């Protein structure tokens, strides 16, 4: 049976002219299978099905290179004091007792189902997921990622996957100071599992799943682990993501242990290269460090929302871009709303730069599309052009919360939301229509997530000093009025 040829229409289409995004009025996109055949107006050929989305913006799907694959704990840490005091960071006594898994294997996979659904719902079509290792016994494993790969194929999300591996873990001493626990053998074993996963799953599900090397963060790596990672990356030509330059603790630890900066240490192993993507790049030792990033071709993944919540910011998006550094985007935290990250990223950049000239909204939009594609070495993603993969999103326009209409991107940047995405096609497959991710029961997914989040909160008590009652670890935004309110279940029992 032949593959149907599908045509999409809308009042606006973001095309690509070979150099830049361009806007088509009353535009059309035609694709067959997973490949785009036409972008413009007045397609002359035959089409099996036309879908007219009316007053909407058809554009390329967003690329999220630090995509939340977790039940995000930010809602617990927000305005809750030191993370070591609430059991998010491992306590020394928890480490000595022996860490354990917060979730079962089935629950781990459910986390990804919930998170991947959120990504698709918000217009993200390519994701490189991230989860927290604080809730794990030690990193991630091959078998669970075989399940994540199958889930990607089921939901239709394009993913870059691999089990996270690490040789160290940060923990808290009783006085609140941070220290490192090392397990070199576990780190190297994890890398072997990651290499095996890459060889077995790179290109799986008709190319929807690609492999990647995803060590946890630079301060949890040892020289031996980075040296071997570099060798594997070179052998496999694999994308590598490594969190670095993101905290003062990391910068100081790397300087103390390795007698160099984070970026210099990576560069010494050849890990600053065009196949390397680096969240977050907040801290560096000077302009020469930025030039090092530009010269090596490594990409920086900008995650503005998660850092702004903690009072920190990239300084600045425009300055990094002016240096010639390729910038991609990541959501990193909940919600998986790329529009919110673009909007806040623009505002933060302008505050940092002191004007409205160095960074434009199109620069952020490019980072979430073309920049992400460049970071992955994919000139067939992040754009709607003949020959590109049919990763297409549709955002409604004219919604009441968007205000009076002037320009599709400007209205979405100023007042749009992730759930303004009403349809998504990934590799030509319809994965969401009318805001509904196909095959997903949102209410059931939310019910199960709420139950699992309860388990996550209780696990904090195991990791905290003295194993206190879990509810004593978290503060509500407003003090409870009485003891009944403080002790009542967080969620009411469902009514039928």
Model-found features: residue ranges?
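His/Asp/Glu-enriched, well-ordered alpha-helical/loop segment
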Residues: 12, 268-275, 316-399, 414-417
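C-terminal cap of metal-dependent C-N hydrolases
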Residues: 15-17, 390-446
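Metal-coordinating catalytic core of metallo-dependent amide/deamination hydrolases
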Residues: 138-279, 288-289
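Alpha-helical scaffold segments that flank or form the walls of functional sites
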Residues: 77-158, 190-206, 450-458
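Histidine/acidic-residue-rich catalytic or RNA/ligand-binding cores of hydrolases
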Residues: 171, 248-260, 287-294, 311-320, ...
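N-terminal metal-binding scaffold of metallo-dependent hydrolase/deaminase domains
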Residues: 1-45, 54-58
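Active-site gating loops and adjacent loop-to-helix segments of metal-dependent hydrolytic enzymes
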Residues: 76-108, 137, 168-187, 248-275, ...
């Amino acid at each position: 049976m032949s593959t149907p040829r599908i045509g999409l229409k809308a009042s606006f289409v973001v095309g690509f002219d070979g150099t830049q995004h361009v806007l088509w009025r009353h535009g059309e996109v035609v694709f067959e299978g997973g490949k785009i055949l036409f972008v413009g107006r007045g397609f002359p050929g035959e089409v099996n099905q036309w879908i007219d989305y009316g007053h909407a913006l058809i554009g390329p799907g967003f690329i999220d290179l630090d995509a939340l694959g977790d039940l995000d704990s930010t809602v617990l840490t927000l305005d809750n004091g030191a993370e070591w005091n609430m059991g998010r960071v491992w306590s020394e006594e928890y480490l000595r007792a022996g860490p354990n898994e917060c979730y079962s294997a089935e629950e781990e996979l459910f986390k990804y189902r919930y998170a991947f659904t959120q990504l698709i719902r918000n217009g993200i079509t390519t994701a490189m997921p991230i989860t927290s290792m604080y809730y794990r016994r030690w990193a991630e494993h091959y078998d669970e990622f075989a399940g994540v790969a199958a889930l990607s194929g089921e939901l239709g999300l394009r993913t870059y996957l691999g089990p996270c591996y690490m040789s160290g873990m940060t923990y808290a001493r009783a006085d609140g100071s941070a220290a490192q626990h090392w397990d070199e053998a576990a780190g190297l074993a994890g890398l072997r599992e990651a290499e095996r996963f890459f060889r077995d799953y790179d290109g799986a599900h008709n190319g929807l799943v690609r492999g990647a090397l995803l060590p946890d963060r630079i301060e949890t790596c040892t020289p031996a682990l980075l040296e071997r990672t570099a060798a594997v990356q070179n052998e496999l030509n694999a994308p590598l993501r490594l969190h670095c330059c993101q905290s003062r603790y990391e910068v100081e630890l790397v300087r103390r242990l390795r007698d160099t900066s984070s970026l210099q240490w990576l560069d010494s192993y050849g890990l600053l290269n065009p196949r390397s993507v680096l969240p977050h790049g907040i801290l560096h030792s000077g302009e020469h460090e930025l030039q090092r990033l530009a010269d090596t071709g490594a990409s920086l993944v900008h995650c503005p929302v998660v850092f702004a919540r903690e009072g920190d910011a990239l300084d600045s998006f425009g300055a990094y871009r002016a240096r010639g550094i390729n910038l991609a985007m990541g959501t990193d935290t909940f919600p998986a709303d790329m529009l919110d990250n673009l909007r806040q990223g623009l505002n933060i950049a302008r505050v940092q730069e002191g004007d409205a000239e160095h960074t434009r909204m199109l620069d952020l939009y490019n980072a979430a599309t073309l920049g992400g594609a460049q970071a992955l070495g994919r000139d067939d993603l992040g754009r709607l052009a003949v020959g590109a993969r049919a990763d297409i999103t549709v955002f409604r326009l004219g919604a009441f919360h968007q205000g009076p209409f002037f320009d599709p991107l400007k209205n979405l940047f100023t007042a749009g939301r992730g759930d303004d995405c009403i349809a998504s096609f990934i590799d030509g497959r319809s994965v969401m229509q009318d805001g509904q991710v196909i095959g997903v029961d949102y209410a059931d997914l939310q019910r199960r997530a709420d139950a699992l989040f309860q388990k996550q909160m209780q696990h904090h008590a195991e990791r905290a000093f003295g194993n206190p009652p879990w509810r004593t670890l978290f503060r509500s935004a407003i003090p409870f009025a009485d003891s009944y309110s403080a002790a009542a279940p967080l969620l009411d029992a469902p009514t039928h």
